Regions:
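Hydrophobic core of transmembrane alpha-helices in multi-pass small-molecule transporters
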Residues: 13, 91-105, 210, 289-302
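C-terminal membrane-cytosol helix-exit motif in multi-pass small-molecule transporters
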Residues: 144, 166-186, 365-373
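Juxtamembrane intracellular "pre-TM" segments in multi-pass secondary transporters
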Residues: 1-2, 180-208
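Helix-to-loop junctions at the C-terminal end of transmembrane segments
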Residues: 53-65, 252-263, 346-347
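Cytoplasmic helix-loop-helix junction between adjacent transmembrane helices
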Residues: 98-133, 307-310
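C-terminal transmembrane helical hairpin of 12-TM major facilitator-type secondary transporters
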Residues: 265-305
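Structural signature of the two symmetry-related core transmembrane helices
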Residues: 69-83, 266-281, 359
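Helix-loop boundary and gating motifs at the non-cytosolic
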Residues: 1-47, 201-240
Length: 377
């Protein structure tokens, strides 16, 4: 069993190396090809495809009763679509990235796989998963900043082409890792359940997710560009993101244990408060040390450890993949709307003004998600 978990973690690490690389490469390429409006569309529109993909693949995973097959299929298709990106203009980049994101929506099912390994330690095991995810994302973003200097973006420069091909290759390694893992099968009585009956008692979790990521994207969607400006180079930006990934990797197992030992809602409160405070810092100073400190906390990881554990605790297995997909959909819907809005706002506003607006939205998320979530089961 430990070997199978290790293979799944290897797949998750490689997959998130691709996500970290894409986080830097796609945003920097889009910004070089156009303006902030182009960047907003390249980041925002694919999020709506991710919404559709996460819902669609969640339903497919429930019907097939095979999460691994969905993850392998989606990882392979999304990896191939990295190959043409360096040769595309703004419209082509938006189009292919949107298509790719439909398949990326199925990757949420790796979290469902881990949530089934040990019901008594769901958050602990998902903490190990998040450690691989956090380090992979941080290391990938660093590679993007290290391999390509900011002046080379906006063209099919050899370093840009190599970086996207490397991203596709790492995606193939992720497929190999996922194929070697084994999904735990537990016989269950096949009964028809009404999803709405289980959704509404914890619906506030989904609305909190939407609002928080709507506000957080007021920074995160443009973070590679902003951090490059603050740090003075894409390499400096990569160092900041790598440090964040290392913090994620080190803290993930401990945060997972805390989520197992304390009410899940505390993770929601902690992450929403932290993202609010980080946006306040971004809007108040451009000091590289303060900006770096604000970027380090594992906000995304902490939020989803708590949220996924709440879903696993309160949604029956037959509906759980759909609920996980819906959670991701709400986060991506907020991210998509936030990214497009930010692209429009930055045409006439400064970074700091945009960050202040984001802090207002995240404060609302704190209020909406503060109280415990009611349970149906």
């Amino acid at each position: 069993m430990q070997n199978k978990i290790g293979l799944a973690l290897f797949g998750a690490l490689c997959y998130n190396l691709t996500q970290g690389l894409a986080f830097t490469l796609v945003r920097m390429q889009a910004n070089a090809l156009g303006d902030f409006r182009t960047l907003g569309l390249v980041v925002g529109l694919p999020n709506f495809a991710l919404v559709a993909g996460s819902i669609f693949w969640g339903i497919i995973a429930d019907r097939w009763q095979n999460r691994k097959a969905v993850v392998v299929l989606c990882a392979m298709c999304s990896s191939i679509l990295y190959i043409p990106l360096p040769w595309l203009g703004p419209f082509g980049l938006i189009l292919i990235r949107t298509l790719q994101s439909f398949f990326l929506g199925g990757m949420v099912q790796i979290a469902t796989l881990f949530s089934e390994l040990d019901p008594e330690a769901r958050a602990t095991l998902m903490g190990k998963l998040e450690a691989a995810l956090g380090f992979g994302w941080g290391a990938g973003a660093f590679l993007g900043g290290f391999l390509v200097i900011s002046e080379d973006y906006g063209s099919s420069h050899p370093t840009v082409v190599f970086s996207f091909l490397l991203t596709a290759s790492l995606g193939v390694f992720a497929v190999v890792g996922y194929m070697g893992s084994t999904e735990r099968y537990v016989p269950r009585e096949v009964i028809k359940l009404n999803f709405a009956e289980y959704f509404w008692p914890i619906s506030r979790l989904f609305f909190t997710t939407f609002i928080m990521f709507l506000g957080y994207m007021f920074f995160l969607s443009i973070s590679p560009i902003y951090l490059t400006e603050v740090a003075g180079s894409s390499f400096g930006m990569g160092i900041i993101v790598l440090l964040s990934g290392i913090v994620h990797a080190i803290t993930a197992p401990y945060i997972g244990k805390l989520v197992d030992n304390y009410p899940r809602e505390k993770a929601i409160r902690a992450s929403t408060i932290t993202v609010f405070l980080s946006l306040i810092i971004y809007s108040s100073t451009t000091n590289i040390y303060f900006v770096t400190l604000a970027f380090l906390p594992p906000i995304y990881m902490t939020y989803f450890l708590g949220a996924r554990a709440i879903i696993a605790d309160n949604i029956p297995y037959q509906l759980r993949a759909r609920a996980m997909g819906l959670l991701t959909s709400f986060s991506l819907l907020g991210s998509g709307v936030g990214s497009i809005v930010v692209g429009e706002l930055l045409v006439n506003m400064s970074f700091q003004d945009v960050f202040r607006l984001g802090s207002v939205l995240t404060f609302i998320a704190i209020l909406v998600g503060w109280y415990p979530f009611k349970s149906k089961i």
